């Protein structure tokens, strides 16, 4: 049976960790599906990892649809989540809903992911009301890399931390069914996870999120040019064993440890957040 948004809400209620992996092809999707990974994210990171681009901004809808279709063929039980690429939803309402629907109709994805908070809340509401599950993404949002000034930790001070909390509440209220938190301080992610009713999925945001996500190539150590603080290599000899180790460490709370997390907020700042 295909995993569902309802099953992820139940996991949050039972304090059971959700496992997510970013992957881009049929073969890796089959491995992840066989390892009982909850969610396979077809991330726009494929622009850099698969297509050799400098960032995620140039990947197109048609390219994302092709890779999502391949993953959907390989995943029989895992929930397939597709990244909506840059400017596929930030423009008109019509573009947002038509592009989201293409992932469902043409590539057989089960939901879509968008980056941003209050500024895209209306788009989240529109897409979710059409019957398409929407996952939001806050913190380090790669599609906004030019505004953020590079790939760096977000929410390190009181003002920016409160902004992320406000955005998290806004996307939940607009109908987002889940929230990815990327590269925010561990205590901020913990606070957001406790405030929200929807599950949080962390990447570089500590162990208190309701689940974790890593890129398939990164957790297996296949990308020698990239080793972020939040990445752990599990096994590059046998992908099945590597994915199973990742899954088990996420579920048991072993991963991520403090060495894979960022901690910039002191208790005095946390007490001022609401």
UniProtKB/Swiss-Prot annotation:
Catalyzes the reversible reaction in which hydroxymethyl group from 5,10-methylenetetrahydrofolate is transferred onto alpha-ketoisovalerate to form ketopantoate. This is 3-methyl-2-oxobutanoate hydroxymethyltransferase. 3-methyl-2-oxobutanoate binds at residues 44-45, 83, 113. The active site is at residue 182. It is found in: Cytoplasm. HAMAP family: PanB. The gene is panB. It catalyses: 3-methyl-2-oxobutanoate + (6R)-5,10-methylene-5,6,7,8-tetrahydrofolate + H2O = 2-dehydropantoate + (6S)-5,6,7,8-tetrahydrofolate.
